[in-house]
Regions:
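Intrinsically disordered, low-complexity proline/glycine-rich segments
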Residues: 1-155
Length: 155
């Protein structure tokens, strides 16, 4: 299964449109302009809020993710000199790869649960999330949004 994340270029806040593999709108994401810490609200196609990525005040970027109002997990950027690394607190998932180049995998045990790539030659950033388990769709989306927010935080 696949989701496409397209970032809107001319927007005051982080705004993303999310499409399914056939190109139909599935979700949209809207960031808060004035908030203490980074906040991204995820809505389904009918406009109901279904998820939240919330930045916590910390020395390095830390993000909590919520699904349908319930705590789902946490993503924390580790201190490294050259390449960013993240600690994930969700079902034993771990992320490896090139986060700044948007080519990374999320593993559950020894298997790839989610594969993330950046599509070249698009107006604005376009990311592709591939996953095999339909139950991983929203957790994977929230995780990718949190990693994007952590990369953009500049820490």
């Amino acid at each position: 299964m696949r989701l496409l994340i397209k970032q809107r270029v001319f927007s005051w806040t982080d705004t993303f449109d999310i499409y399914d593999e056939t190109g139909n709108p599935k979700y949209f994401v809207k960031g808060e302009l004035f908030s203490l810490g980074h906040r991204l609200h995820v809505y389904d196609a009918s406009g109901q809020e279904i998820g939240l990525v919330r930045g916590k005040l910390a020395l390095l970027p830390v993000f909590e993710i919520e699904l349908h109002g319930a705590y789902l997990g946490r993503i924390e950027k580790r201190f490294t000199l050259f390449r960013p690394k993240y600690d994930l607190e969700y079902r034993g998932w771990r992320a490896e790869g090139d986060f700044l180049g948007w080519n990374y995998d999320v593993y559950e045990a020894c298997c790839v649960a989610v594969h993330v790539t950046k599509e070249p030659f698009h107006w604005g950033d376009t990311y592709v999330i591939d996953f095999s388990n339909p139950a991983d769709e929203l957790p994977a989306l929230l995780l990718v949004l949190a990693i994007d927010a952590a990369n953009c935080s500049g820490s």
